[in-house]
Amino acid sequence: MKNTQTSAPIDHMISLGDNRHIRVWETLPKNQEIKRNNTIVIAAGFARRMDHFAGLAEYLANNGFHVIRYDSLNHVGLSSGEINQFSMSVGKHSLLTVIEWLKGRGIDQIGLIASSLSARIAYDVAAEINLSFLITAVGVVNLRSTLEKALKYDYLQMEINDIPEDLDFEGYNLGSKVFVTDCFDNNWDSLDSTINKTKDLDIPFIAFISNGDDWVCQQEVKKLVGNMNSDKTKIYSLIGSSHDLGENLIVLRNFYQSVTRAAIRVDSEVIDLVDDISEPNFEDLTIITVNERRLKNKIAKRNVR
């Protein structure tokens, strides 16, 4: 039986000391008759907040999943820090902190969904800790190449002190010296570094690519998957989509449907897509989006006091 109950997510705060924290939102399963094996963590892409994934969380919850979202440190959103101090390693630390927090609450079976830049972080995390499955959407595999396409220039070829500090990426100041230094110091930059991290990955893994993605090369994603020593991998294409999965409602709905179908299957260690899912209606999605916006604004006002 479908449960169309809508509400705001449960708000949590992970305190880290030094007056820093990570904000986490929890969405409980909307359909209690379906029992899933895993809690799903959603890692949003660069310059995206957790509330940008309200629709996906609702789709997953409508199909029986317990869903966790968070805002990274030094990023946009409700967690501590400014985005001009963001680095891939900070993003990785944030994700690992959320997963450890879940384990501290007795939640050990965890699947991860990551998009865009966060997918590159997810590849590192999946190689280092026990996850049940990994799903990526328009996931970055060659960070240097993606940055060059997005910024229209390969700034990583420059001496660190010559790189402009105010590079605009997705409408935000990247804080280029911090970001680039971390890329080189911790081997985030190349396709080879991603391949080396994931070659021994042996969990169900589904990668969604977009046929109109100008930032991520489909052949590089296929090369990454082809180098994995696993028979639990699959690539699906989101037809008609670019790197921006929210560019229109048709693309967005296809993204929600496809990822939900994938999550249901990999939750049972299968890498095909299930045919039927329970979709929330448009009114429910509108209500949850408005509720999350109100919650975000309420928390943001408290944070500036």
From Swiss-Prot:
Pathway membership, UniProt: Lipid metabolism; fatty acid reduction for biolumincescence
Family assignment from sequence similarity: Belongs to the LuxD family.
UniProt feature coiled coil, ranges: none
Keywords from the named record: Acyltransferase, Luminescence, Transferase
Species per Swiss-Prot/TrEMBL record: Photobacterium leiognathi
Name recorded for this polypeptide: Acyl transferase
GO MF entries: acyltransferase activity, transferring groups other than amino-acyl groups
Pfam families: Acyl_transf_2
Record's function text: Acyl transferase is part of the fatty acid reductase system required for aldehyde biosynthesis; it produces fatty acids for the luminescent reaction.
Classification via InterPro entries: AB_hydrolase_fold, LuxD
Active site residues per record: 116 (charge relay system), 213 (charge relay system), 243 (charge relay system)
Gene3D superfamilies with a match to the protein in the record: alpha/beta hydrolase
Biological process per Gene Ontology, one example term: fatty acid metabolic process
Gene (UniProt): luxD
EC number in record: 2.3.1.-
Signal peptide per UniProt: none
